């Protein structure tokens, strides 16, 4: 669908919608707004739009929980709210949030990453919010916060993270279907 936006910066990873999608060029509180929804917690991820669903990450910093939300694209109704992790939030820049990574969706599953407890946590979920697989990459220290969104390429989910702890980082690929490490 030309109007789908399956990952951060859109279908071509350049922030440009297809001309045939005819996105609105102007909007305000009363113009070109289909629906609005309260988002529990705080997050800086971009909405991901695939088919009849909109996905978004959020974090409740008081309860120290991280969630993936799924909305009905037409109505804005919350279809599900999946708590992914709870507890052990680390240092973060106060201008960042613990839900800055955007969801990536291939139409079959959704993928996202969070940072907490000195770990990068990456998950795959079904379109109904059921956990398919999870990866935990330990030994990370945040300088300004974490915000890298998973990149989908062929059968891979590619993950990247910088690391204040040792000056190194992470660049890895896992299989979309089963989460097995590819490189």
Residue map of PLM features:
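Noncatalytic, solvent-exposed loop/strand surfaces
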Residues: 1-183
